[in-house]
Curated annotation (Swiss-Prot):
Function statement: One of the primary rRNA binding proteins, it binds directly to 16S rRNA where it helps nucleate assembly of the platform of the 30S subunit by binding and bridging several RNA helices of the 16S rRNA.
Classification via HAMAP family: Ribosomal_uS15_B (MF_01343_B)
GO aspect biological process, one term: translation
Assembly and oligomerization: Part of the 30S ribosomal subunit. Forms a bridge to the 50S subunit in the 70S ribosome, contacting the 23S rRNA.
Keywords for this protein: Ribonucleoprotein, Ribosomal protein, RNA-binding, rRNA-binding
Name under which the protein is recorded: Small ribosomal subunit protein uS15
């Protein structure tokens, strides 16, 4: 259920400040968004996977907290990040 190393590296390269920037808020948000999108297809097929759904809700909550932090600290970066990811907030 996790992302491949190549996909993670591509996301870090797209959203990070450099190739090894994995800790910035926008990279973490992008990685969580990719994982959430991947899990949504899983739950379309496995409707009774309640343990996995708990993990999904935890990821959504963590992404929401990171988005709130980014909005509070850098509004322009927040707006560009949600536009690039296609999130509605």
């Amino acid at each position: 259920m996790s992302l491949s190393t190549e996909k993670k590296a591509a996301i870090v390269a797209e959203f990070g400040r450099d190739a090894k920037d994995t800790g910035s808020s926008e990279v973490q948000i992008a990685l969580l968004t990719a994982q959430i999108n991947h899990l949504q297809t899983h739950f379309a097929e496995h409707k009774k996977d309640h343990h996995g759904r708990r993990g999904l809700l935890r990821m959504v909550s963590r992404r929401r907290k990171l988005l709130d932090y980014l909005k509070r600290t850098d509004l322009a970066l927040y707006q560009s990040t949600i536009a690039r990811l296609g999130l509605r907030r």
